[in-house]
Amino acid sequence: IFTSGATEAAGLALNGRGIRCADIEHEAVSSWCQSDLSCGLDGGVACEAPEATALQLANSETGILQQLPEGLALCDMTQAFGKLPVAFHWTGATMALVSAHKIGGPKGVGALIVKRGTEVAAQIKGGGQEMGRRSGTENVIGIAGFGAAAEAAQRDLADGVWEQVEKLRNILEKAVAQSASETIFVGQGGRRLPNTSYMISEGWRGETQVMQMDLAGFSVSAGSACSSGKVKRSRVLHAMGFSAEQAACALRVSLGPQNKQEDIERFVEVWSAHQHRLQGRRRSA
């Protein structure tokens, strides 16, 4: 069912269903759910009733991957789609969300994927498009662009593009750890998206890091890409059990196929210089 994006698709899937989730889910999902499921420091969610649970395949903030139980009510594939070799039937879910702009396609188009025989009540009624489940003239150009982006994403996966991105991410984390050994990398050691590094450097506010790196030409954030620009504590890190101070000092770095090793080296050089100056001021205070 084509929609204006994953946010609309989430509402179409979840409205009136009484679904539960953990507070690490994207707000497009959690705002429709009862957010009472527990989550550990590893980002894993305890899911005892999958048929009444919404769960993301990859967290939009940390990049941590979930172990999906069979029969899940809704799988949010938005962040993982295009970066991992995934397919709807592989998730075992009844419904799933995807979005075009997350794979380099046009903004303003997404889809709700539904297992055959699943009832979906239309929220937009009128002309009966999308088999009566989402009325309104389809964004044909956007949908075509979505298809082209999906084909390109498949080629990138086949060519090992994201494996190279993962190598760069690991080089970045190793270099940062050598420069500042106390840095915490959220989800490191577990299964994560290949492009995401979420770093905590206690005593160095996330929004300060963002501004300093921005002045050096690096686009980073203190939260998920959808929430960048909003200065507030990460509810994802809070739900995982990190302290308020740790959550306030988090920096999210997201890499792409266009990045090269010299980008990583320059990033680490700039980040480490700021971090060392901060440590020096503390020692002299």
What are these regions (language model features)?
Residues I1-A285:
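Pyridoxal 5′-phosphate
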